[in-house]
Each structure stands twice: as C-alpha cells, then as structure tokens.
Amino acid sequence: MTDCRYFKLSPRDVAFRLELIHRVHGLEHAENYFNNISNKLKTFSAYGALLSGYVREKSVEKAEAIMQKMKEMDMAASSFPYNKMINLYSQTGEHDKIDMLMQEMERKGITQDEYTMLNRMAAYIAASDISGMERILNRIEEDRHFFVNWNVYSMVASGYLKVGMIEKALAMLKKMEGKMPLQGSKLAFEFLLTHYANTGHKEELYRV
C-alpha cells in the first residue's frame, strides 16, 4: 500500500492516507492529495477524512463546503458528518448552528447517537445553558438505547458547578459515583475528586 503504481488503493486506504498526510504535512497537502485522486476513490471515506481535517483545523467555511457537497452526493445520510460539524460548531461557539443541524437530523430521520448527544451537551455547558444541558440529560436517561456512564454525570456536574449550582452538582456526583466501575477507574476518580473539591464540601472530598 506504499505506492499506488504497484498497489491498488481502496477507499479506506485513501482515507487513511488523507489523515496521515494532514497530520504529518498539513492541511494543504491533504487537500492536494484529495484533489488529485480519481473520482472513483472520492467516496464517503475520503470526504469524511477531509471533513475531519477541516474540523481539526477549525476551518468552518471549508468544512461547511464539504458538508454541502456530501449532502448533494447523498453521503450525509448517517450521523457521522453531522457529529463532526456539531463538534466544530461547539469549538467555535456557533451554538445556533448546532440547533439547526439537530433539527435537520430529526427532519431527515438521521439517528442522533450518543456522540451527537454528548457533543450537544458540551456545547450547552460551554454556553452556560443549563436548561439545554438538562434537556439533553433527560433525553439520554429516558432513551433505553443510550448507555449512561459516569462521564455523562461528570459533564453535567461540571455544568452546574460552572454556574454555581452546588446542590445540583452534588446530586450529579452521587449519580456519577453509582456509575463508576467497581474495580475503580483512575480517570473517573480524579474527575470525582476535582468536582468535589470545586463544590467546597470537604467532607465529601475526604469521604471518597
């Protein structure tokens, strides 16, 4: 797979190369590679890899152009490109565009998976929109298809702490403890300790 003169490249190979070229040589080289491959190899995988690169670089205009192209070519029928754009808008603070994307997903019957929900929740937390955050939490808790792990309650606790809602944060931390693995998770434990420290309730910090 090292030389296209001797090995036939698959769409997955092209996507892998695009990701690698972007990481090693930069976005411009990745774009040149994409522009020079045959149309046959410009599949969902290739467009998805290029979109991921634009999101990584926070290049909104180019990401939106590729997203539009994917829609025109019927390559935006899954949650993947939408999740990428939600991630991008969350990073750039364009929360109104996230709402539009989620409405579009609902209108087109595209499943809003766990990644979609968590990205939307993160955007609400960044905007200190507590009602929005709670709305997403309720959807996740009520949908039997979602697995609510400790990280979800950790995110919600951080949202409450951000706006000074200590009692609600403490309630989420209790739920977080209930979702932590029995054998313990170093990462989860570190988050839990940090959150309890931020509540100012030292007795909870010492308890855990």
Language-model features and meaning:
Residues 174-179, 187-208:
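Structured C-terminal portions of repeat-based eukaryotic scaffold domains
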Residues 2-3, 72, 103-107, 138-142, ...:
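Amphipathic alpha-helical segments of tetratricopeptide repeats
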Residues 10-15, 30, 43-48, 52, ...:
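Pentatricopeptide repeat
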Residues 1-91, 103:
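Leucine-rich repeat
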Residues 30-37, 63-67, 98-102, 133-140, ...:
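Alpha-helical repeat scaffolds
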Residues 19-27, 56-62, 91-97, 122, ...:
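Helix-turn-helix repeat elements of alpha-solenoid scaffolds
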Residues 141, 153-165, 177:
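Acidic, glycine-rich loop-and-beta core segments that form the ion-binding/anion-interacting portion
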Residues 5-6, 39-41, 58, 74, ...:
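Inter-helix linker motif
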